[in-house]
Amino acid sequence: MQIIVLASGSKGNAIYIETENSKVLFDVGISLKTIKERLARQNVFLNQLDAIFISHEHTDHTKYIIPVMDKTNAKLFINQLSFDYLTPIIRDKIDTRRVCFIDKERKYLLNDIVVIPIELSHDSKNILGFLIKAENKNIGIVTDTGIVEKRYFSLLQKMHILFLESNHDVNMLLDSNRPWALKQRILSP
């Protein structure tokens, strides 16, 4: 198995996981050029992708859906609310026959990888984390979450690899165009 964190943070997120029979990208928040360059360093080529899983609709996770989908035959796995939010941007630019709607706590089998979306807490339409089972390993991807539900603690403790992505920049928050009530909630203890 090969796992490559291509980017993590407010400027863009993307994680690549490859097994013997599957090549999957989780989020596409960085440019096509950057994705291609970083994968090529490991002799991985974008046109080999089988699937793209999207955690939620924010641009640091979705900004480059269209160019990446254009360069692959990959299926796009996304929840309905995030897709609906993105529809004005991606309408007529993605073949909807390649879109698979996903729900929390359901298993999705892609060749030799099982992906189970889990519910997270974030200011988005419907954020999902991912529990992945591949090659006798358990991998968790938990990004942009304020709270992890207690019901997931035991599952996350069983992960061989757990990606937790979070950042908290007070100045960036205060300078943002978010509503004051939201800023206060985020800054609260």
PLM-predicted stretches and their roles:
Residues 1-42, 126-144:
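Conserved beta-strand hairpin/beta-sheet module of binuclear metal-dependent hydrolase folds
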Residues 26-29, 49-57, 77-80, 140-144, ...:
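Active-site neighborhood of phospho(di)ester-bond hydrolases with catalytic His/Asp-centered motifs
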Residues 33-78:
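Active-site metal-binding motif and surrounding structural segment of the metallo-beta-lactamase
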Residues 59-62, 84-85, 124-125, 147-150, ...:
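Active-site environment of divalent metal-dependent phosphoester hydrolases
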Residues 80-129, 133-136:
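Metallo-beta-lactamase
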Residues 150-189:
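Cap/insert and terminal regions of metallo-dependent hydrolase folds
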